[in-house]
Amino acid sequence: MTLAYIPSPTISQFSIGPVTIHFYALCILLGIVLAVWMTTVHWKRYGGNFDQILDITLVAVPSGIIGARIYHIITTPERFFGPTGDWVEMFRIWNGGLGIWGGVLLGALAAWAWCRHKHYPMALLGDAVAPGLLVAQAVGRLGNWFNQELYGAPTTLPWGLKLNMEGSAIGHSEQCYDGATCPTGTLFHPTFLYEMIWNLIGAALIVFLGSKIMKKLKAGSLFAIYIMWYTVGRTWIEALRIDFAHEFLGVRINVWVSMAVFVLGVVAFIVIQQMGKSTELLAEKLRTVTEIELSLVEDGETGLPTAKANLTKTKDEITANDGSSVSYADDQSDNK
């Protein structure tokens, strides 16, 4: 008889009148709120403000969710298009199914496009968002707990996960390897908990590095560290999971993807350290852009002379190190 285990929730949703609210969605929303808050704190230290992060969030988050869903659909097409598939399930995100790499890719592309449009240093944004992104992913994993999904192999460890076979939870089957049903009461590795702990440790590590040795790192280094940290954790945690997944050479596709992205993270870190721009220089650029925006908001077109005057003090440095012209005060006047 098992004396210690992690219980599963008895519900995965609740209703307020005609509206059904899923805990999976609430976990994602809470993660987004925490990520925005943490990103804003770090972004302000670089010279930006909350309004800039809010604008980026409104562009990047919807794009990231769409990208994450597309990645899941591509990697598990039989759920939606197979003989037993249902294409309507593509739109039922609350039932689970978001692929982190699709979210990071499309969300990052959207953020990059907005930063380029507004002349914000994308490398600084990556560093600012890195710890918050890990915290958001950690909180989001709680949604898997409520859905009783993505658990690992059977275990006898005292922190094993015991599935709830009653109530309104989505996961009702104690599946072992190859879809076979395990004996009732089987405990499973709580992979959601492993990833939560791993991500929170990574977030703390990145915050520590950012506060202690940031002057030794080029802008963008913290985001590269995020990529390396997350992919290492995802590789070993993914290997514990027993839910259905496509494989290549006997290894889950997501493991291959994580290893490939880890290599890209290492390469990115090396390139950034060799060819990247200093955090202080890009922070000065961000402060200047922020001053321009504030001048335009407060003074309108009459604020352009002041904005251009503020820009003069960093024009030579930014032009030399950013490889682009710094005559964007006029552009900002069009975007106010």
Swiss-Prot record:
Entries under InterPro entries matching the protein: Lgt (IPR001640)
Residues annotated to bind a 1,2-diacyl-sn-glycero-3-phospho-(1'-sn-glycerol): 141
Disulphide-bonded residues: none
Protein keywords: Cell membrane, Membrane, Transferase, Transmembrane, Transmembrane helix
Species the sequence originates in: Bifidobacterium adolescentis (strain ATCC 15703 / DSM 20083 / NCTC 11814 / E194a)
Organism superkingdom: Bacteria
Pathway(s) per entry: Protein modification; lipoprotein biosynthesis (diacylglyceryl transfer)
Transmembrane segments: 16-36, 53-73, 93-113, 190-210, 220-240, 253-273
UniProt-listed Enzyme Commission number(s): 2.5.1.145
Protein's recorded name: Phosphatidylglycerol--prolipoprotein diacylglyceryl transferase
